[in-house]
Design a protein with these regions (language model features):
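Alpha/beta-hydrolase
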Residues: 169-258
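Conserved hydrolase catalytic core segment
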Residues: 103-148
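A catalytic-pocket lid/entrance helix-loop region that shapes and gates access to the active site
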Residues: 135-170
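Active-site loop/oxyanion-hole signature of alpha/beta-hydrolase fold enzymes
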Residues: 15-18, 29, 56, 64-109, ...
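Catalytic active-site module of serine/aspartate enzymes centered on a nucleophile-bearing elbow/loop
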Residues: 274-308
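Conserved HGGG/HGGXW glycine-rich cap/lid loop of the alpha/beta-hydrolase fold
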Residues: 24-78
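Alpha/beta-hydrolase fold catalytic core
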Residues: 1-35, 56-64, 100-104, 139, ...
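Conserved loop-alpha-helix segment in the C-terminal half of the alpha/beta-hydrolase fold
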Residues: 240-287
Length: 308
């Protein structure tokens, strides 16, 4: 099994009626910018371990690194809701940054969902972010008002499916089954890292009949579609308000094209990035959407010089 090189501690931070689980490497150092890492959809803060381990000693020593489990993921408590709203992630992040760095801005890195949140947060709270890195946080395809009736209907239908139990996440007989699932989703993930991730991505639970199965640490309600259409005009205005130097990183596999199949393309995403006042792009080679798992050394090598 993979052996973590830099061991974090677990902290629980009260945020908006939730106990937020946060993995923390190092201590706060006056004058040193904290680094905040936020994960993507159906993931956990532990996913960043491989990148943290790949950072050089010169960079990591004396810098506090913070990686929360978003609400409804990992060890962060479920909010007691049956669907999730993107603005809640921004507010949670705002409280989290205030807790760990009340007096100075932070460096913020987000992957996928976390990258989208990071971009929106950086444009909404520009004074709180020193430098920003977005890993594959592409946003969503543009929408039209005519889609609204169908979107609301789909949202209500999916809520009913959730409450019927139709959207429950699959459970596994053991941690090995969880690891196999991770490798099926990402064929580049090696066995040792999959085995290590499995213990943080899921947990064993014993049912009333005495049977124990491993359950994914993610709320099934995350599968519910957002009731509101993606408002591209609003997003681009927020991008224009980002003051932090920004690095947009994508994987060589073009996961955006593979997922949306022409409905939304890398070329469109690159056009959107032109709205960010100070933005540059980089590509991680031989990597897919989970590029921080596939090539942690490449990701770390991009992060370090940009965040110095």
């Amino acid at each position: 099994m993979y052996q973590a090189q830099r061991l974090p501690r677990s902290e629980f931070v009260p945020i908006r009626h939730l106990q937020y689980h946060v993995r923390v490497w190092g201590e706060a150092v006056p004058g040193q910018t904290p680094l905040v890492l936020v994960h993507g959809w159906m993931d956990v803060g532990a996913s960043w371990q491989f990148v943290v381990d790949a950072l050089s000693g010169a960079f990591a020593t004396g810098r506090q690194i913070i990686a929360p489990d978003w609400r409804g993921y990992g060890k962060t408590a479920l909010p007691g809701a049956d669907n999730y709203w993107l603005p809640d992630y921004l507010a949670d992040l705002d409280f989290l940054i205030d807790h760990y760095s009340p007096e100075q801005p932070v460096d913020l890195v987000g992957h996928s969902l976390g990258g989208n949140v990071a971009m929106l947060y950086a444009g909404s709270r520009p004074a709180r972010i020193r430098r920003l890195i977005n890993l594959e946080g592409f946003g969503m395809p543009a929408t039209k008002p005519a889609q609204a009736p169908g979107r609301y209907a789909k949202w209500m239908d999916e809520l009913k499916s959730l409450h019927r139990g139709d959207l429950q996440l699959h459970s596994y007989a053991d941690a090995t089954g969880v690891a196999r699932r991770l490798m099926k989703t990402n064929p580049r993930l090696p066995q040792d890292k999959a085995d290590w991730l499995a213990q943080f991505w899921a947990e064993p639970r014993t049912a009333a009949d005495g049977a124990t199965r491993w359950h994914i640490l993610g709320d099934a309600a995350h599968k519910i579609i957002n009731a509101n259409l993606y408002q591209l005009d609003e997003v681009l205005e927020i991008y224009r308000s980002i003051s932090a130097p920004t690095l947009a990183v994508e994987a060589s596999d073009d996961s955006l094209g593979l997922w949306w199949k022409g409905r939304y393309t890398l070329a469109e995403y690159h056009e959107r990035l032109k709205c960010v006042p100070d933005c540059r792009r980089a590509v991680v080679q031989d990597a897919g959407h989970m590029l921080h798992h596939d090539q942690p050394a490449q990701v770390a090598a991009l992060l370090e010089p940009f965040l110095i």
